Regions:
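HIT superfamily nucleotide-processing domains
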Residues: 1-134
Length: 134
């Protein structure tokens, strides 16, 4: 059975896509810890990030770096930098969380999630896209 992320890759369900290339996809988390919280995934469904082959794992991190730099530019003045987390429990599809942060407590997955309207999420995704350099 396909993960929810594979369904996003296949455009079976909608997402607020920030960037993609032939192997990787970045889209906004719909239950974000912060404004511009973005998920970066390989298009190939692999449950555990460290089960990716070396080339795919390296490519995922290089792609994530480009997205993080775009988030940094988009969030300038609202966050100090983009934090990174790999948890791997909530969806059985390898993914990296990119979370704009001001301090370490901003990346606490136990805290309540933020809520944004569809229009706000679309505007955030479009704002980040302007800074993506693939």
């Amino acid at each position: 059975m396909s993960s929810i992320f594979t369904k996003i890759v296949n455009r079976e369900i909608p997402a607020y896509i920030v960037a993609e290339d032939e192997n990787y996809l970045a889209f906004l988390d719909i239950n974000p810890l912060a404004k511009a919280h973005t998920l970066v995934i390989p298009k190939k469904e692999v449950s555990y990030i460290f089960d990716l082959d070396d080339e795919s794992l390296a490519g995922l991190w290089i792609f994530a770096k480009k997205i993080a730099k775009a988030i940094d530019k988009y969030m300038q003045g609202e966050a100090i930098r983009t934090g990174v987390a790999v948890v791997g429990l909530e969806v059985p599809h390898a993914h990296i969380h990119l979370v704009p942060i001001k301090n370490i407590t901003d990346i606490d997955f136990a805290k309540p999630k933020m809520k944004f309207s569809s229009e706000e999420l679309q505007n955030i995704a479009e704002g980040i896209k302007k800074f993506v350099e693939l």
